[in-house]
Amino acid sequence: MKLVRFLMKLTNETVSIELKNGTIVHGTITSVDMQMNTHLKAVKMTVKGREPVPVETLSIRGNNIRYYILPDSLPLDTLLIDDSTKPKQKKKEVVRGRGRGRGRGTRGRGRGASRGF
């Protein structure tokens, strides 16, 4: 299972997130998208070396997240079960006669070929 798919299951869980700049964000996850952008509510944001600031809602861009700190009470064994069904791959048909490109006549066909004009 991809990490992002696991994080998408954490809706309504209260977590702490440490950002790459050292800021720690503590709040309840409302959603996580495929780019790991995380949306939180009831947030307490502690910028490195400052007092905590309460924020109603906050969105964090995924590439700014260093790591998630999950609560100990989280049932990881049930969340890590991959419940998505994998689509069956179709067999590719062999297509012939498309390998030489779609150029202009005999141009670029090697030595001794006519010039094409």
Swiss-Prot record:
InterPro entries registered for this protein in UniProt: LSm4/Sm_D1/D3, LSM_dom_sf, Sm, Sm_D1, Sm_dom_euk/arc
Subcellular location, record wording: Nucleus; Cytoplasm
Stored SUPFAM superfamilies: Sm-like ribonucleoproteins (SSF50182)
BP-aspect Gene Ontology terms: mRNA 5'-splice site recognition; mRNA cis splicing, via spliceosome; spliceosomal snRNP assembly
PROSITE patterns: SM
Lineage top rank: taxon: Eukaryota
Record's compositionally biased regions (Basic residues): 87-117
UniProt cross-references to SMART domains, sorted A to Z: Sm (SM00651)
Residue ranges of domain Sm in the record: 2-74
One Pfam match: LSM
Function: Plays a role in pre-mRNA splicing as a core component of the spliceosomal U1, U2, U4 and U5 small nuclear ribonucleoproteins (snRNPs), the building blocks of the spliceosome.
Annotated protein name in UniProt: Small nuclear ribonucleoprotein Sm D1
